[in-house]
A protein has these predicted regions:
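Short beta-strand elements that form the blades of beta-propeller/WD-repeat-like
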Residues: 72-80, 123-126, 438-443, 485-498, ...
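Hydrophobic or amphipathic alpha-helical targeting/insertion segments
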Residues: 89-95, 102-157, 205-236, 240
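Repeated scaffold domains used in trafficking and secretory/extracellular systems
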Residues: 58-69, 104-118, 428-431, 482-486, ...
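N-terminal beta-propeller domains
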Residues: 1-93, 237, 241-328, 400-484
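Amphipathic, non-transmembrane alpha-helical segments in extracytoplasmic/periplasmic proteins
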Residues: 64, 180-196
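Polar, low-complexity export/assembly segments characteristic of proteins
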Residues: 155-172, 194-246, 250-279, 285
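Short loop/turn segments immediately following beta-strands, especially the blade-tip
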Residues: 453-457, 506-513
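Small/polar beta-strand repeat architecture
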Residues: 215-240, 292-303, 322-413
Length: 531
């Protein structure tokens, strides 16, 4: 074959596995220890800079997540079977508090079963082997069986009637010299109290509250001869929100069903009194949208993704996302004990007498006790122990500052239909990611994204309308079974991978991704590994 001479425009295209006939002139077959840099050209690949070992033994099957908080604070987190450790880049190991234990991390294959994503100081951790669940032991606050009678207006020559458990009481205004909604309500309450046993009544102006003393159910109905325009009887539900009075028992939950003139589904409201937090207090207040009573409304935190959070002292905390408060045990010292008096020595401890301080005496990464201290000087303080401690040793402590962990959002409005559980509930979460200011998870063939900028909220905050910032829950539709395994944000798109098909999460709106505009379309169909 004759020698061919020609110019090559660049050496930066790297290697190509295409056939010789289809390769570009600047594609190479082999490139060893070279870096194709568009600024510097083809340069020698940088060598290894050895810094430190993060372990003197083989780590084995682990999941590693790099935490790049900023240019000065970078960490390596290592998740193994039932444990998590965090290291600085120089190999220094940071303390990880584990108040809820590490049962969530139990898996013999953490490299493939643990998935993580870091957002600011929070690293969200998913164990693919754990099935999510709702908390079935704590249900949304609800009603005892009760009712209110509301005389909204009064008319001359009108009869108002209320029937409770078959007992009917009426009041006729034909002979009244003065028309008063309060007087009509009083007459109805007095008549019912005289004709019924086992009931309690309370009245505030034109509103009468009625319930049975044993909390059991009862029937109630009411009418007036003005076409039922004056008298409103509420027991569990009502047609129009505008018919509800501004005086009601605190905590009373009512379903607003709507009528032919409304364009919304049913929703629920709870009465909040202005000057009381005691359920049943009958006074002025306002109605607020709420969840149906007696339903599951929050997650089982043990089964949901956990977080690895960087604390203010630079150490870390691995915990459930349950809203607990905690104190940073960010100061070290030594202690000795004489009788019940414990003396702690720590240079420039910065505490004051009467401070409430938490201590870890056992190096178990958890609080062993909380005590009120007496400062001796800038370097020592004392407290009285309730029992015997180890005579002396090292101690970690911190002033109680009640830092609060985030908490997974709850179903605060609607019911299981209007504000359903996210589709990952009852399933295993396959992966977790961050996209367009939303935290997202993959479960089966669904992509579930939180409320915009609310990384812990998977429920809607109102069911009266669909808001652009609401959570998004969409499924990948395909003739093949498409269990989504990976999600990669790229160029304003979210690329989704299943075993045999790749999808793209798109929006019918160029600028926004909303529950109304989100859509998943097929991109390519190649087999991919789950590694």
């Amino acid at each position: 074959m004759g020698l061919i001479s020609r110019s090559i425009p660049t050496l930066l295209r790297g290697i190509s596995q295409a056939s010789d006939a289809t390769k570009q002139p600047d594609h190479a077959d082999i490139q060893d220890n070279a870096d194709s840099n568009p600024v510097l050209g083809l340069t020698k690949r940088s060598g290894l800079e050895y810094v430190a070992n993060i372990s003197n033994t083989t780590l084995g099957n682990v999941h590693v997540q790099t935490i790049n908080r900023d240019v000065d604070q970078r960490f390596i987190s290592v998740f193994s079977n039932g444990n998590v450790r965090v290291f600085e880049l120089d190999g220094t190991e940071r303390t990880v508090q584990k108040p809820d234990g590490t049962t969530y991390l139990n898996t013999t294959t953490p490299r493939s079963d643990i998935k993580t994503v870091t957002v600011a100081d929070f690293t969200f951790v998913v164990n693919k082997t754990v099935t999510t669940a709702m908390n079935s032991s704590d249900l949304s606050p609800g009603n005892i069986t009760q009712a209110i009678i509301f005389v909204s207006q009064v008319s001359d020559k009108t009869t108002y009637s209320v029937t409770v458990d078959g007992v009917t009481v009426s009041d006729d205004t034909s002979s009244d010299s003065t028309l008063s909604t309060t007087q009509v309500a009083t007459d109805l309450r007095t008549g019912l109290a005289a004709g019924l046993t086992g009931f309690t009544f309370q009245q505030n102006g034109p509103v009468v509250h009625i319930k049975k003393t044993d909390g059991s159910n009862f029937s109630i109905d009411g009418n007036d001869t003005q076409g039922n325009q004056d008298l409103v009887v509420v027991k569990d539900s009502i047609q129009r929100f505008s018919d509800l009075p501004t005086v009601s028992p605190h905590g009373y939950v009512v379903e607003v069903k709507g009528d032919d003139t409304t364009d919304f589904d049913n929703y629920y409201v709870r009465f909040v009194a202005n000057n009381s937090t005691v359920d049943g207090t009958l006074e002025e207040g306002q109605w607020e949208e709420c969840a149906e009573s007696g339903i599951e409304f929050k997650f089982d935190y043990d089964t949901m993704p956990h977080i690895l959070i960087r604390q203010s002292d630079g150490d870390f905390r691995f915990a459930r996302v349950d809203g607990d408060t905690y104190t940073d045990l960010n100061t070290a010292g030594t202690y000795s004990q004489s009788g019940t008096t414990v003396t702690v020595t720590s240079a420039n401890h910065g505490l004051s007498s009467s401070d409430s301080v938490q201590f870890d005496f056992t190096s178990g990464n958890a609080v062993d006790g909380t005590f009120t201290i007496t400062v001796t000087n800038a370097n020592t303080f004392t407290f009285t122990a309730s029992g015997s401690l180890t005579t002396s040793g090292n101690v970690a402590f911190g002033k109680v500052n009640n830092s609060t962990l985030p908490k997974w959002g709850e179903r605060t409005v609607g019911d299981l239909v209007s504000n359903p559980n996210p589709s990952f509930m009852g399933k295993k979460i396959n992966n977790i990611f961050f996209y367009r200011s939303r935290l997202g998870v993959l479960a089966d063939d669904n992509v579930i994204l939180t409320t915009v900028s609310e990384f812990f909220q998977f429920f809607r905050e109102t069911v009266l309308t669909v808001v652009d910032s609401d959570p998004i829950d969409v499924a990948a539709s395909h003739t093949k079974v498409s269990i989504l395994k990976h999600a990669i944000p790229m160029a304003e798109q979210l690329i989704l991978f299943s075993d045999q098909t790749q999808f793209v999460l798109t929006s019918s709106s160029v600028l926004t991704l909303t529950p109304k505009t989100a859509n998943i379309v097929v991109a390519t169909e190649f087999e991919s590994s789950d590694a």
